[in-house]
Amino acid sequence: MKLRIQLVPKPLFERTLREALGKARWDKLRHRLAETNGARCGICGSTQRLHGHEVWAYQQKKGVATAVLLKVQIICIDCHDIRHFARTTKLFQAGIITPDRYGALRKHFRRVNGCRQREFDEHFIRALRTWARRSKQKKWKIDWGEFRDQVEVAKAARTKWAQSHARRSLTT
């Protein structure tokens, strides 16, 4: 299957490379990766509305589990909405995504993977079960992989900024 639903465990919501780097660094990385990939979706080849998608591997053990960042993949909005299909479904149920858009996304999955609706439904159910199992794990550590140094630089810059602004507020 070229296009898969990849649901992020609940304890890891908002713990993303994008958040760790900050918007400016994330945008710079995303644009560099898009240029490297010919400004095309790494899954379906579309050139429309490209996103940076974090690809993670999860290692669950008793105690502390680990989320390992494998890569940042450039993908289109359709593939991105499929990767996070539980979120997409919530937006659909809230009326934020139209029935036409929701149906088009399901069709996109079937077209990219050359499968039937039943296979999509089964894949989604398996993804939800995996998500539920992983979400029960409360303690997680993050391995930023090849992005570790970039995360450390961003963290140091934020700390330096916070310290300089704290000193300013004390002197005014």
Located regions from the model:
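Histidine-centered nuclease catalytic patch
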Residues: 42-74, 83-95
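Short cysteine-rich loop/turn motifs with clustered Cys
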Residues: 23-51, 76-78
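Extended charged
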Residues: 1-28, 47, 81-172
